[in-house]
Amino acid sequence: MALDIFDKNDFKEKVTKKSFRKEDIFKDGYFTITDIKQAVKNPNRANIFVNGKYRFSLDIFQLTQLNVKIGAKFSEDEIFNLEQQSEFGKLYALGLNYCLIRPHSEKEVRDYLWKKTLNRKLRNKKTGEFYEKKGVSIVSAEQALQRLIEKGYVDDFKFTKFWVENRNQRKGSSIKKLKSELFSKGVSSEIIEQILSESSRNDGEEIQKIIAKKAKKYTDEKKLVAYLARQGFSYDEIKRAILKEEF
């Protein structure tokens, strides 16, 4: 899900050229921003050229915050920091899009961003040769996660409430299974218990939903009992539900 944040006129205003001489590009050991071009594949970002060559990309908010303009000069350490900001910006955008698909737990988002830190073996479409793409820094991944938490896009309370309210709502799901799923996603037992205590879902109603869906498939009572047990329902709950169906 792309976020269309660029306005062409605004972009031009942010990167308005300043007059500078070519001989000043390397003056005093500083690096000069020689050009800024709106990215083609991702128009929400701008490609930054340093000393005549592409170096990194930033989003429009970063251009303003970091005061990156054509003709601006930066030290080697400052350029390195800008590259780290570039990496952070890309990761934050990826994490944000991931969170907007559906709510995710903190562990899910951390695992998603962690994968970006791993080196990947890719294939060049033109030459067919394989090459290794270096992963992003762990620091940038953690910074992106913390920003998502600060902005409220990652919240285990909200995620757990979403999961309990929507997970197999029509098909039915045992409370035990819901707990197991949430625990596997890194949600603490305290949060799970609190949200479930506030929920109207209960095993009595959930098992009836499942029986209504599966009764035709499992005509043999023993097989139905075994299936319900695998779904996390207790033996007593299963027997009560089946007796209720019989009457």
For the regions a protein language model found, what residue spans apply to each?
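An alpha-helical, amphipathic repeat domain used for nucleic-acid recognition
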Residues: M1-F247
